[in-house]
Amino acid sequence: MLKELINKLLWHPDYNSEDYLIKYLHRGAENDEKSVPLKNIVIEDSFLVFDETHIPFHRILEIVNLKNGEILYKKR
């Protein structure tokens, strides 16, 4: 489900990837959390790649619409 949502936000013409932010678990960072704009993400098998950082899907905490603050995905 999460991978499908990210693909939809990246590639569907009704969505603009610049409008979304991914928050993910990053141990050692402030509050153990970092964020990356969706537009900078590349999807690989079971993780996302940002620059040289690999983010496993299980570490994604939220996907947020920056325009209206809507949370599209939140890890339970």
Swiss-Prot record:
Upper classification of the organism = Archaea, Methanobacteriati, Methanobacteriota, Methanomada group, Methanococci
Task: Note the HAMAP family from the entry.
Answer: UPF0248
Which species is the source of this protein? Methanococcus maripaludis (strain C5 / ATCC BAA-1333)
Family note: Belongs to the UPF0248 family.
InterPro entries this protein is in? MJ1316, UPF0248
Please state what the protein is called: UPF0248 protein MmarC5_1387
